[in-house]
């Protein structure tokens, strides 16, 4: 009965964190609106080979992540839950792999149960795992690679090793088809310390070719299909999205070497106090037969790899949290047995985080010291919801701190208030510029019959296209990440410059209403826009809706 009760509690906790909130949070631009629309177009056109965004060639990523996202919308429909389901599915499968690996490494049921709990409630994992991006998918394939290599290394039979390396090839192949060739580099650097320390080179060289062959066979059908349909894909994807993005001096998202350290620290909440001890114990046990060194290698080596790369984003280190959660779970259970101070300190940290959050809410509220508060006076209920969310965090931290021997696991409940309430507490000023669904809903009666819809922001373009279920959104003045697709001869009608807008409008408005949804710069007003006078206008924060009717 006790195990059944625990099982039901874990399922309920998962539903509260990962299922219930999904449909109640508006989609964020640019990421969620982009991936929502790419998958919608894939379903609408039936083209499962070439990724398109707003009807344009979009070669930022390969195809497999879009497949998973499309299946989510196909199963659950045209809603926010369907858009985000692919990420939740991938991160859930990763958690199950974490549980499997924890059991195979330590043969401890408690470690196997606690590891996915820590993984799913870690802030970085939760934030990305409920957000419609491709990083949860690549994390799934890298976790599968981590598990399959360990399974192959521990197999006692030739058939077991063949199966493990074949599965490794599948994982790497799907990783390549999700995010590119980094899916090959990360497993190599991840296993390197363990292979060197255990002197397993001969086995790797003997069976590694099988993984390479299987990986190639997985990628080959789609790789040849897209090369035939779009011969420029592989050139653009390799040189622009890999070399320029990660290695060159002008790399995209350039950041210093230490960039990921704050994200590792904040991302480990609400289990932060376990981080130093888990890493230290993993290092001290590196010479033991069990897999502490293997797990530590999968944490440290990818972390260093991405730190060395010039282009950086917080989501890149998500795969590090799979092995890290196993090390943290084992350390937490040992600390509970020995009465180590780390569990009390963890409660204190969570209490402090909750209290700091409450103070921050007060500071940025209409009654705070900020000249321009985050929330306005009519958003009192949002301040209250944010305060409740942080109060829950502080309460769970306080309970764990008072009795760390029995209540330390309450840390898993610390982010629950945020998970359930954050979607309702987003300030209006943020919604206006970052969540275009809100504006589209307000002006939908005018937008729906529009013959032409233009916008100067790619993220808003994705939101408009997804909400209106039309891919013919025209970019106005700015091309952004769509420059490559817009440069093709068959895409010339998808962009209108600001200088040529007046002439374009005179030619096209007779065909039907022309609508513009523009994101203005900070401090800019609608009257500052150098545009012809519209027939209808609506301003919402930094976003303005303009409409020109036929004359």
Curated annotation (Swiss-Prot):
InterPro entries: ArnT_tfrase, Glyco_trans_39/83, LipidA_mod_glycosyltrf_83. Its EC number is 2.4.2.43. It catalyses: 4-amino-4-deoxy-alpha-L-arabinopyranosyl di-trans,octa-cis-undecaprenyl phosphate + lipid IVA = lipid IIA + di-trans,octa-cis-undecaprenyl phosphate. It is a multi-pass membrane protein. Coiled coil: none annotated. Pathway: Lipopolysaccharide metabolism; 4-amino-4-deoxy-beta-L-arabinose-lipid A biosynthesis. It comes from the Bacteria. GO terms for biological process: lipid A biosynthetic process; lipopolysaccharide biosynthetic process; protein O-linked glycosylation; response to iron(III) ion. It is found in: Cell inner membrane. The chain crosses the membrane at residues 8-28, 81-101, 111-131, 132-152, 176-196, 207-227, 255-275, 291-311, 313-333, 349-369, 380-400, 408-428. GO terms for molecular function: 4-amino-4-deoxy-L-arabinose transferase activity; mannosyltransferase activity. Keywords: Cell inner membrane, Cell membrane, Glycosyltransferase, Lipid A biosynthesis, Lipid biosynthesis, Lipid metabolism, Lipopolysaccharide biosynthesis, Membrane, Transferase, Transmembrane, Transmembrane helix. The keyword Cell cycle does not apply. GO terms for cellular component: plasma membrane. It is an enzyme of class 2 (transferase). Belongs to the glycosyltransferase 83 family. Catalyzes the transfer of the L-Ara4N moiety of the glycolipid undecaprenyl phosphate-alpha-L-Ara4N to lipid A. The modified arabinose is attached to lipid A and is required for resistance to polymyxin and cationic antimicrobial peptides. This is Undecaprenyl phosphate-alpha-4-amino-4-deoxy-L-arabinose arabinosyl transferase.
